Amino acid sequence: MNNFELRGGGGGGGVRLAKKPYDYFKNINIPGPEPWFFFGNMLQLMKKRMAKFDKEMKQKYGKVLGFYICNQPHILISDPEMVKEICIKQFAVFTNRYDMFPPDGVGDKFLSFLTDLHWKFTRTLLLPTFSISHLKQTMGIMNRVVKNLEENFSLFADSDKAVEMKQVFSCYTVDMIASTAFGIEVNSQKNPDHSLIKCFDKFFYVNFYDPITSVQTLFPVIPKILGTFGIKSNFSSSLQSVAKFSKDVIAERRKNKTVRQDFLQLLLDAKLENVDKIDDDMKHELETLTFENMSDWRSKRGLTDEEIVAQVVLFLFAAHLTTSTALSFFSYILVTQPEIQQKVYDEVMDVIGDVSFPKILAQDQ
């Protein structure tokens, strides 16, 4: 066998090995679009955008299908019962997520991207934030923020100008999160040019055709390489801007030594002291940790400052976009369907009347 045959055989083997990941869904009989070598279905996804891509894929391949981002397999599930099983009943099984953030000390430490026992531990610390008793304590604060929104609506009603409701609800949501979770008054409803609002706008309206952002999206390993050299896209820059805001909030809370029953206080109470002085025995214990001795871990292993900031940023982002977008669509439906608007109002007033936490809670019984 000559050198040409050896090289040809080696090259062919390399190509087959590179193509092997694209056989994953075929091997387990999950339908889906044919992937392109190296890119998978990523270019189709970017061209059509996520909503259109998902809709077309569901219509063509059914409620469960597989596609690839580069050589990484992804399963798209549109079956409500299956989604319920995965996200609620079996959620503890699906803890680890797709790793997409560079090592910037913020995004890579989000709860949603932590893995295994690190995820379980951090999630356990955050659970009290969403308890009924905590939500009840924040009702008065929430009412004040809603009052500001009502005053704004009155001003809108008295003017003949068009109103950008997405911006209105964006400011409202920021005010609600900042006051209930962090004990600070942003009042962006009165000041829509607040720096935090600008950070959110920059983050959520990322241009995915920006060269650096496109590369980071297409090739998940690239952000980690770029991040080590300090190269950032608008996405990463806006993330760092909100992280700086979060650090300032944390510093102010520590400086004033104020204790509140809120999300931020839970994180600060879990602060890991002397993080640089963990001995080798404890490091070994953390590395070999099992779920059974996790309660002992909590008493030893708190959260680092980076982890605290990351969860604050995640809380701000996760709560902001989902809530403000839902309210924007809801307001559009009500204003274009006045008969439905009146029906909703009448039923709320008939069943609940003036809103209070006990009345809301009673509706679930």
Language-model regions: role of each:
Residues 43, 131, 239-326, 360:
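Conserved cytochrome P450 catalytic core segment spanning the I/J/K helices
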